[in-house]
Amino acid sequence: MTVLCVTGTCTGVGKTVVTAALASQANQAGIDVVVCKPVQTGTGNGDDDLAEIGRLSGVTELVGLARYPLPMAPVAAAEQAGQPLPSRDQLVQHIRGLDRPGRLTLVEGAGGLLVELADSGGTLRDLAVDLGAAMLVVVAAGLGTLNHTALTLEALAAQKVSCAGLVLGSWPAHPGLVESSNRDALARLAPMRAVLSAGAAQLSVADFAVMSAGAFDREWVATLVG
């Protein structure tokens, strides 16, 4: 299987735009790409991460499983909607059904690594374990990011989930000493795969494609497909 999970150190660090950029670059390189967002909350406010990924990346195979209207953690959003969360096995089988030789299957989580996505308490980390998938971690640039990133990497290592690297999801136009220092320190924790400028999601589709084409190392992207 060629499944790569995408998580963040917290909500709002840029998981969706990073997923879109990686999908766009792989798509432009001729790789067959499918993007899966197993659990999405906040759909009642018009939030649709899969639609945004499709708009930005040009990828047309976009797959979701469970959607809840309130912008809350999945467990709470499901409770408020009076709907169950899918089971861990349902999520795993759903994702496995998408994968095939030569295809890159990107799986974007909700919130951070240990947010519960399944009715049994299953998390994105659990799905990665079941799928044998590596985890790409989207990180912030500001204060607190070193601790948040280190905790996420420790949680991955505890279950022997491989970290595929880090991505700075929203690099400021005018970084200060804190951001620059953090960028160097983060690169010592795990390979820095890409640095996306703040506001990338507001680019035109054409400009986003140009940005994405060089966002990640091409050789690394090629290695993602088995």
From Swiss-Prot:
Substrate binds at T41. Its EC number is 6.3.3.3. GO terms for molecular function: ATP binding; dethiobiotin synthase activity; magnesium ion binding. InterPro entries: DTB_synth_BioD, P-loop_NTPase. One of its GO terms (cellular component) is cytosol. The active site is at K37. Signal peptide: none annotated. GO terms for biological process: biotin biosynthetic process. The keyword Secreted does not apply. ATP binds at G12, V13, G14, K15, T16, V17, D49, E108, G109, A110, G111, G169, S170. It is found in: Cytoplasm. SUPFAM superfamilies: P-loop containing nucleoside triphosphate hydrolases (SSF52540). Pathway: Cofactor biosynthesis; biotin biosynthesis; biotin from 7,8-diaminononanoate: step 1/2. Mg(2+) binds at T16, D49, E108. Belongs to the dethiobiotin synthetase family. PANTHER family: DETHIOBIOTIN SYNTHETASE. Homodimer. This is ATP-dependent dethiobiotin synthetase BioD.
